[in-house]
């Protein structure tokens, strides 16, 4: 199982004080030393954490492959084509969201996606689509000719958190998941079964499969056991643990679970 370490939250910490430190660039050598397989960054349209210079420096200087997440807006594709990372993962964006809330509406945005994918692949950039776990999204992704899909695991992570953490007792509780434990357990089981079946479906169609969003040290193993998933992209939980253990140990701890 490959691990892509998302270092966005280093930039989040920097932007909390609008200063120059910590610099996400400093994480590159640590990630490599800890045997991460990939660096993942999200250059958002609103530049709320990573900025253009961050993306440029990271892509140019990283010894590990860089997976650049970005929206399908032509201006963002312009940047991706200029920087030429190893891979671009196309993601949906809403300016008001705290984090990416769901997968791309692949079946409803095919014209825009086709143009973005064509431009990226002409620059010999691998393309991945960040999608919800749904059969129609898998099929549409295959039809678009991309190399990868990445399943949005946010629903699985939210159910797990409401079931096995104290999230339900905090102000971050998820109202629609305030359900009996027996119901949540069934939902969690169904979500994992769906991820497994859809990953197998994707592999039959020739797609490589990644997954990410909300994965942490408590919930990751069940997803990592799905054989058809080749890669996990994980960020916030690793950066959060690094506050206490250091980044290298936090990555090693995650690698030990995969």
From Swiss-Prot:
Q: Where is the active site?
A: 42, 69, 213
Catalytic EC class: transferase
Binding-site positions, 3-amino-2-oxopropyl phosphate: 6, 17, 214, 235-236
Query: Where does this polypeptide localize?
Result: Cytoplasm
Q: Which reaction does it catalyse?
A: 3-amino-2-oxopropyl phosphate + 1-deoxy-D-xylulose 5-phosphate = pyridoxine 5'-phosphate + phosphate + 2 H2O + H(+)
User: Which molecular-function annotations from GO does this UniProt entry contain?
Assistant: pyridoxine 5'-phosphate synthase activity
The record's Gene Ontology cellular component field reads: cytosol
Q: What HAMAP family does the record tag this protein with?
A: PdxJ
Q: How does it assemble?
A: Homooctamer; tetramer of dimers.
Q: What does this protein do?
A: Catalyzes the complicated ring closure reaction between the two acyclic compounds 1-deoxy-D-xylulose-5-phosphate (DXP) and 3-amino-2-oxopropyl phosphate (1-amino-acetone-3-phosphate or AAP) to form pyridoxine 5'-phosphate (PNP) and inorganic phosphate.
| Protein name per Swiss-Prot or TrEMBL | Pyridoxine 5'-phosphate synthase
Organism per entry: Sulfurovum sp. (strain NBC37-1)
Q: What is the lineage of its organism?
A: Bacteria, Pseudomonadati, Campylobacterota, Epsilonproteobacteria, Campylobacterales
